[in-house]
């Protein structure tokens, strides 16, 4: 594809999509909020440590590829939003699946259904499979089905926004992190708490800006 993403660009794009779909009231995202989202320990594979300089560079790359833009909301803090849905004509179910693949790498049908639930509910595995088929049968495919490895019961699916998947090498890379497992109840609670903390931080920052503006009237 013409818009090949590197690892940091993929993480930033995935986070922008995720926050738009899970916490739209705090979207678009500031650079600080986006860095926090990129470095979450839940809903991420692998876990990454990206400072704001790295995130800003990834945003520059996405803006050059016309996949992200500076939001024109008139606020004092610059905020960013993604353009993937508009650029590729993706519907919410497709966007949710692509987002999970960007954030966690190759996954099975069952894993995708469970993990995408927070963004878009799927009634059954057939619904997820239908979305994956649409993404694979596009003029320029966005998803591919990986060969099933020995010892695995199910095949996994991977996004192609980072270029062609080198099958065995890709599988080995993710196997090094350990096999994918379904999120436990504890993982779900941690994910929700982290999202609430991020949202509260954004709200505090907004209140501080209001206070600063108010003080400025008397200076």
From Swiss-Prot:
The record's comment on protein family reads: Belongs to the UPF0502 family.
What HAMAP family does this protein map onto? UPF0502
Q: What is this protein called in UniProt?
A: UPF0502 protein Ppro_2903
Q: What is the lineage of its organism?
A: Bacteria, Pseudomonadati, Thermodesulfobacteriota, Desulfuromonadia, Desulfuromonadales
């Amino acid at each position: 594809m013409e818009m090949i993403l590197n690892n940091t660009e993929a993480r930033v794009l995935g986070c922008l999509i995720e926050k738009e779909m899970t916490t739209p009231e705090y979207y678009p995202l500031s650079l600080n909020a986006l860095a926090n989202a990129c470095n979450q320990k839940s809903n991420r594979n692998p876990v990454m440590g990206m400072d704001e300089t790295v995130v800003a560079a990834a945003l520059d790359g996405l803006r050059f590829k016309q996949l992200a833009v500076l939001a024109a909301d008139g606020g004092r803090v610059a905020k960013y939003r993604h353009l993937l849905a508009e650029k590729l004509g993706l519907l919410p179910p497709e966007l949710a699946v692509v987002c999970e693949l960007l954030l966690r790498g190759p996954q099975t049908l069952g894993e995708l259904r469970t993990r995408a639930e927070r963004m878009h509910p799927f009634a059954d595995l057939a619904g997820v499979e239908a979305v994956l088929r649409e993404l694979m049968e596009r003029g320029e495919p966005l998803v591919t089905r990986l060969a099933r490895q020995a010892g695995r019961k199910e095949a996994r699916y991977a996004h192609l926004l980072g270029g062609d998947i080198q099958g065995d090498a890709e599988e080995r890379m993710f196997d090094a992190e350990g096999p994918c497992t379904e999120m436990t109840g504890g993982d779900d609670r941690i994910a929700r708490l982290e999202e609430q903390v991020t949202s509260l931080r954004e709200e505090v920052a907004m209140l501080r800006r209001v206070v600063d503006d108010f003080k400025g009237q008397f200076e």
